[in-house]
């Protein structure tokens, strides 16, 4: 996906939508990572990059995205250039809405929590969303939900099967919504009330804004370096 400003912007958009897809795949515990990614320190970008390489062999949409998309997915945690820093910064800004919390259960068993579950003091019941493709019947929380790797494996397999047939970014967006609406973006040491889909779309929106500022010259390489260096401070 090279040769024009619009195509490069679309590459950043797709990469940001998919930047955490490796978390979803890793939760299934059903896919191994190739040894060639061993030098990448953080786990889920390896899954993201490997999944994209596999799709590129089967699907012309992902094949046309080129190697640059794989590189953006693989290195957004340890950026080497400005585009990777844009995605890293967008990710950090999008993640700043999460509330910290205690986690006693295994991280892959914790469901997405409904945002209304903490409105009332003294509420001892715990509610969560089951893993299932988005539908009217599944869009309601249930009491005492605990997820399993087998459930994640079924969800991932169904997602990948449909993903292999997509032809454009619009289809990609709505397919991500269909399968990631019920997947928590983070469960370890944070309250799990933000879905992986909501985090992905918010991060993509921020990344596009940063990219436009960068393309217009209002955001420089020096600015990106300063902001990513100070993002945790």
Indicate residue ranges for each PLM-predicted region.
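Catalytic cores of nucleotide-enabled group-transfer and carboxylate-activating enzymes in metabolic
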Residues: 9, 204-216, 231-233
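Divalent metal-dependent catalytic cores for phosphoryl transfer on phosphate-bearing substrates
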Residues: 1-161, 179-192, 196-198, 226-232
């Amino acid at each position: 996906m090279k040769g024009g400003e619009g195509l490069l912007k679309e590459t950043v958009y797709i990469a940001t939508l998919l930047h955490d897809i490796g978390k979803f795949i890793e939760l299934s515990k059903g896919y191994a990572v190739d040894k060639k990614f061993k030098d990448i320190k953080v786990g889920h970008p390896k899954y993201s990059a490997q999944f994209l390489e596999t799709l590129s062999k089967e699907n012309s949409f992902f094949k046309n995205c080129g190697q640059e998309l794989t590189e953006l997915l693989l290195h957004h945690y340890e950026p080497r250039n400005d585009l990777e820093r844009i995605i890293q910064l967008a990710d950090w800004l999008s993640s700043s809405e999460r509330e910290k919390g205690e986690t006693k259960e295994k991280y892959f068993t914790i469901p997405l929590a409904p945002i209304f579950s903490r409105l009332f003091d003294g509420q001892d019941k715990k509610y969560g969303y089951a893993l299932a493709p988005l539908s009217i019947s599944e869009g309601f929380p249930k009491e005492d939900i605990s997820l399993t790797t087998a459930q994640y494996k079924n969800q991932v397999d169904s997602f990948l099967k449909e993903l292999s047939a997509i032809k454009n970014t619009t289809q990609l967006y709505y397919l991500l919504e269909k399968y990631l609406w019920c997947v928590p973006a983070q469960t370890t040491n944070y309250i799990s009330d933000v879905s992986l889909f909501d985090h992905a779309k918010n991060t993509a929106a921020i990344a596009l804004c940063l990219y436009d500022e960068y393309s217009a010259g209002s955001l420089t390489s020096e600015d990106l370096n300063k902001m990513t260096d100070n993002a945790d401070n």
